[in-house]
A protein has these predicted regions:
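Compact, glycine/acidic-enriched structural inserts
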Residues: 93-125
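Short, compact, well-ordered microdomains
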Residues: 74, 79-80, 84-106
Length: 128
């Protein structure tokens, strides 16, 4: 997917706008990352199921929602990628808070940098 070209079509930096633009494009059958509207809801359910002092809580999610937080991607390994208006979060499937990777980039800019190998993640696959 050409994220740089996609960026030119986005009217704003909202994660929901980004997700809708991605979903309007053809998806690869064997992609390492799955974009979906349902992933956010699944993420919240997993937060409830795995609730502990060390994991992401519903309260954390509610706080992030104030900044338009939305989970937009799940990897083949079950890890998540989410964004707010100004940050991108790479969240392990374990949901451990201490393992979350935070990047001060909007989702589209994160994907451009990731595709160009300008970002290193211990959680995500090395290549899209």
């Amino acid at each position: 997917m050409d994220f740089e070209q996609l960026k030119e079509t986005l009217p704003d930096a909202k994660p929901q706008t980004f997700l809708q633009a991605i979903l309007s494009q053809p998806q690869e059958e064997d992609a390492e990352l799955t974009f979906s509207e349902e992933i956010d809801e699944q993420f919240v359910e997993n937060c409830k199921f795995l609730a502990s002092p060390e994991t992401i809580s519903e309260t954390d999610v509610e706080h992030w929602r104030e900044q338009e937080f939305l989970v937009v991607v799940q990897s083949l390994d079950g890890d998540y990628l989410a964004g707010t208006l100004e940050q991108t979060f790479v969240i392990p499937s374990s949901l451990y808070k201490e393992d979350i990777e935070q990047f001060d980039k909007q989702l589209i800019d994160f994907f451009i940098a990731y595709e160009n190998k300008e970002i290193t993640s211990a959680i995500l696959p090395k290549e899209l």
